[in-house]
Amino acid sequence: MQTPKNKLVIIPTYNEIENVERIIRAVSGLEGGYHILIIDDGSPDGTAAVVKSLQPEFEDRLFLIERSGKLGLGTAYITGFKWALDKGYDYVFEMDADFSHDPADLPRLLAACEDGGADFAIGSRYADGVSVVNWPIGRIIMSYYASVYTRTVLRTKIMDSTAGFLCYSRRVLEGIKIGRA
């Protein structure tokens, strides 16, 4: 039986007022009790206010870290990873707020780690053809060919190296020694 704090989805935001409530509801609606950590980089559009208004409804499952200014995606994930480790989560997910990743695929990523024995799983927008929403064609082409290039140069089987849709086991995050030189 899984512990209640088993799974955390980290969703960095900046000006995601149009998406943030929908993504929270989509992730919260999944079976398995996924917790959500929104890390907002001082969105001037009120993204953080929307999250705060939803916290009473999703008590003990929806968390918010507000940062002042646009500090970037990488530092948002590092902040989230540290928070997740401090709170005792076993599996930590990266996910965008703009629905470029389907929340319904979170259980598949989890299964790769939890049931499949992987310490790290990457979701792909290209494994079964292109699956992105509201992206300009230039961004789709650039992302696709960046992944092809990465597969070729590094000789890996990673289908979507720019996905940003990942699941990490606690063991991997602890091994990385996040935030240490």
Where are these regions (language model features)?
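N-proximal low-complexity "stem/linker" segments adjacent to membrane-targeting elements
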Residues: M1-A26
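Short, acidic, metal-binding catalytic loop of nucleotide-sugar glycosyltransferases
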Residues: R25-Y34
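Residue-level signature of catalytic and energy-coupling elements of molecular machines
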Residues: V20, V27, G80, D98, ...
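A conserved acidic beta->alpha catalytic loop
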Residues: D40-A49, F99
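Short, conserved active-site loop motifs that form the nucleotide-linked donor/cofactor pocket
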Residues: K7, Y34, R61-F63
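Acceptor/aglycone-binding surface of glycosyltransferases and processive sugar-polymer synthases
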Residues: R67-D86, Y91, P103-R180
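Short beta-strand/loop segment that forms part of the nucleotide-sugar
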Residues: G33-S43, I65-E66, M95
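Acidic helix N-cap motif at the loop->helix transition within catalytic regions
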Residues: E18-R22, D45-L54
